[in-house]
Amino acid sequence: MADTTGRIPLWLIGTVAGIPVIGSVGVFFYGSYSGLGSSL
């Protein structure tokens, strides 16, 4: 493992940033299939 002292690992940034994005896209498509896409 490389020394990441004072630095934030890129995989951590990707995970933290990716979860809300994937969740938002998932909710958007779920709402569209449920007929609630217009409310978004």
Curated annotation (Swiss-Prot):
Protein's name in the database: Photosystem II reaction center protein J
Family annotation (SUPFAM superfamilies): Photosystem II reaction center protein J, PsbJ
Family membership: Belongs to the PsbJ family.
Annotated coiled-coil segments of the chain: none
Compartments, as annotated in UniProt: Plastid, Chloroplast thylakoid membrane
Main location: plastid
Protein species of origin: Acorus calamus
UniProtKB keywords: Chloroplast, Membrane, Photosynthesis, Photosystem II, Plastid, Reaction center, Thylakoid, Transmembrane, Transmembrane helix
HAMAP family according to UniProt: PSII_PsbJ
Membrane topology category: Single-pass membrane protein
Lineage, highest ranks first: Eukaryota, Viridiplantae, Streptophyta, Embryophyta, Tracheophyta
InterPro entries: PSII_PsbJ, PSII_PsbJ_sf
Residue intervals passing through the bilayer: 8-28
Free-text function comment from the UniProt entry: One of the components of the core complex of photosystem II (PSII). PSII is a light-driven water:plastoquinone oxidoreductase that uses light energy to abstract electrons from H(2)O, generating O(2) and a proton gradient subsequently used for ATP formation. It consists of a core antenna complex that captures photons, and an electron transfer chain that converts photonic excitation into a charge separation.
Gene Ontology terms: cellular component: chloroplast thylakoid membrane; photosystem II reaction center
Subunit-structure text: PSII is composed of 1 copy each of membrane proteins PsbA, PsbB, PsbC, PsbD, PsbE, PsbF, PsbH, PsbI, PsbJ, PsbK, PsbL, PsbM, PsbT, PsbX, PsbY, PsbZ, Psb30/Ycf12, at least 3 peripheral proteins of the oxygen-evolving complex and a large number of cofactors. It forms dimeric complexes.
Entry's Gene Ontology BP terms: photosynthesis
